[in-house]
C-alpha cells in the first residue's frame, strides 16, 4: 500500500544521495520490524547484511535513518565494516557543495551538532566502563581526549553561531532595503533535482539572453547549495527578482534547514 510506496521512494532517494556522494550502490535490503535499540535492525537481519556485504565486496554500510552513537558503534563492531547513516551522508554532500561563506558555516554547525551527541555517548560509555567519578585526574587518556574534543566542539559551535547571527543581521538589513525598492521577488521552490534550475535557465535565456547568467544544471540531488537571484523583465516595465533555491528532501537534518 502507501506505506510500501513511501519506503520504496525513500530507499530510491537514499541511492540517489549515495550517487551524489560518488558512491556505487551494490545492494539493498529492508527490515519491517521495530527498530532495535542496540543495532537498529534485528540480530538475524544484521547477520544477513554482513554476509551479503561480504559477498558483494561492499566497503560501507549505509542506513536510511539517523543512528544513535551506540547503534553506530555496535554495528561497526559486529560487521567489522565502515557504517554511515542518512544524516551523515547528507552532511557530507552539503559540505562538498557549499560555496558561500554562510553556507559553509551552516554546514559546519550542522556537522558539529551531529557529532556532539556521539562524543557525549562515547564519553558516557567510557565512564561506565571505567567506573570513574568524573574528575579529570581520575579519567583514562581516551576519556580525557573525548572530553577535550567535546569542549572544543562546543566552543567552535558558539563561535560559528555568533558569526552566523551577524550575517543574519546583515541579510535582514538588505532584505529591508529590497522591500523598499518595491521590486517583486519570485522564488522557485520544490523538491531537489525536480527541475528548478532548468526553469530558471529557460527564463534567464528568454528574458536576458545571456548564457553567462544561467545556473548550473545537473541530474543530481543537491548539485548546488547556492541561491541565485536574477533580475528579469517578463513584461514591459514589470521587473521581478527570480530566485533559484535549494530543494526539499525527506529527513533533512534540522541543522541544514537554513542552508
State where each predicted segment sits:
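Conserved G1/Walker A P-loop phosphate-binding module
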Residues: 133-143, 147-254, 258
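Short, small-residue-biased leader/transition segments that mark boundaries at the very start
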Residues: 1-6
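Accessory, often N-terminal, substrate/partner-engagement and coupling regions
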Residues: 47-121
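Switch II of P-loop NTPase G domains
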Residues: 9-12, 35-51, 224-227, 246-259
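Hydrophobic "anchor" residues on beta-strands that sit immediately upstream
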Residues: 27, 60, 81, 239-240
Amino acid at each position: 500500500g502507501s506505506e510500501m510506496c513511501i519506503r520504496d521512494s525513500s530507499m530510491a532517494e537514499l541511492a540517489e544521495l549515495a550517487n551524489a556522494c560518488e558512491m556505487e550502490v551494490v545492494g539493498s535490503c529492508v527490515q519491517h520490524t521495530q527498530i532495535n535499540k542496540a543495532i537498529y535492525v534485528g540480530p538475524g537481519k544484521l547477520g544477513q547484511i554482513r554476509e551479503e556485504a561480504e559477498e558483494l565486496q561492499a566497503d560501507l554500510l549505509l542506513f536510511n535513518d539517523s543512528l544513535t552513537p551506540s547503534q553506530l558503534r555496535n554495528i561497526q563492531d559486529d560487521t567489522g565494516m565502515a557504517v554511515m547513516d542518512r544524516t551523515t551522508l547528507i552532511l557530507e554532500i552539503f559540505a562538498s557543495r557549499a560555496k558561500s561563506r554562510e553556507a559553509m558555516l551552516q554546514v559546519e554547525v550542522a556537522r558539529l551538532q551531529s557529532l556532539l551527541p556521539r562524543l557525549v555517548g562515547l564519553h558516557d560509555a567510557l565512564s561506565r566502563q571505567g567506573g570513574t567519578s568524573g574528575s579529570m585526574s581520575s579519567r583514562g587518556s581516551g576519556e580525557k581526549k573525548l572530553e577535550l574534543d567535546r569542549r572544543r566542539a562546543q566552543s567552535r559551535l558558539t563561535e560559528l553561531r555568533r558569526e552566523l547571527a551577524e550575517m543574519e543581521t546583515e541579510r535582514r538589513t538588505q532584505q529591508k532595503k529590497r522591500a523598499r525598492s518595491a521590486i517583486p521577488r519570485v522564488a522557485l521552490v520544490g523538491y531537489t533535482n525536480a527541475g528548478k534550475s532548468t526553469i530558471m535557465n529557460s527564463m534567464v535565456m528568454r528574458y536576458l539572453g545571456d548564457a553567462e547568467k544561467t545556473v548550473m544544471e545537473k541530474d543530481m540531488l543537491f548539485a548546488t547549495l547556492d541561491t541565485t537571484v536574477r533580475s528579469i523583465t517578463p513584461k514591459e516595465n514589470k521587473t521581478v527578482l527570480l530566485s533559484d533555491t535549494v530543494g526539499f528532501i525527506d529527513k533533512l537534518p534540522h541543522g541544514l534547514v537554513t542552508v
